[in-house]
């Protein structure tokens, strides 16, 4: 009798994706983040579902409904903080996952990479709308500032913003629709994840050397399932340490004040994972220019396959490119720090220089260094 795992129409798909999948024998811990992102998505959907059972998307009661969840619902505080800090863990894994793709040249799988960038946009949109829901000061003003950016679009901008708001300011209609979108997007993300995996399994995984690994494959189970379980345990340990010891470490104290349209917080800033993009936005004095730079700072990821001029796929054997890559990482840390600082000297000029460096490294320095390395190979 043939194994049901290999014959059943549904189980067969799971088998080919997670059990008998041929995987390169040399993929490192940097390849763990795909499964960790899957876990983060599951955690967010489950905790989010339980939060939605008690949350009310009305401007009068939203803030107190979150308070009610934390005080009166059984383990409500745990669910709420797992959801809030789960988003931070999600983005840490996302950034590391994208960084891995850049370092090892995984972007040469065009379809997988482009779906991944679309996923990044979708997760960022979901996180932004989720941040608005508790209806604290930073929720309200963050929503006002970020949605207002669309007014920079010529001709249709103002109409577009009022259409998104559902009125002439961020109000009840805005909160209700943000809740609706925040609820539906994770399911759209899940569907996109399936497409992402579908494209990945068409080509097979990349590996640290960037070389074709068809001659040396091992089954995904048990080798990489056990490796993923280690990553999962470490992720849960980190998340629960954060949730149980300092749940507000990454949050903003201003969000414990109910939203007040008449009082602007001294420093409006988004959650930490958007700070690098926020710094790029602020570094350009022109509104439309800033918005374009903000969008392009993420969209530029789609250009990587076109900007890849090296004869080698991975950076494993390219020390010059490695140096530039880590300078780019340091630059992103700098931008994240600047995004959280007030708009004053010397932060303004540091932010502008870091923004210029970000685009210069990606569009100019990395391709040039790749060509120099190609020349060095001939010596």
Swiss-Prot record:
Its cofactor is heme b. Keywords: Electron transport, Heme, Iron, Membrane, Metal-binding, Mitochondrion, Mitochondrion inner membrane, Respiratory chain, Transmembrane, Transmembrane helix, Transport, Ubiquinone. GO terms for biological process: mitochondrial electron transport, ubiquinol to cytochrome c. Pfam families: Cytochrom_B_C (PF00032), Cytochrome_B (PF00033). The keyword Ribonucleoprotein does not apply. It comes from the Eukaryota. A ubiquinone binds at residue 201. Heme b b562 binds at residues 83, 182. It is found in: Mitochondrion inner membrane. The chain crosses the membrane at residues 33-53, 77-98, 113-133, 178-198, 226-246, 288-308, 320-340, 347-367. Component of the ubiquinol-cytochrome c reductase complex (complex III or cytochrome b-c1 complex) that is part of the mitochondrial respiratory chain. The b-c1 complex mediates electron transfer from ubiquinol to cytochrome c. Contributes to the generation of a proton gradient across the mitochondrial membrane that is then used for ATP synthesis. Heme 1 (or BL or b562) is low-potential and absorbs at about 562 nm, and heme 2 (or BH or b566) is high-potential and absorbs at about 566 nm. Belongs to the cytochrome b family. This is Cytochrome b.
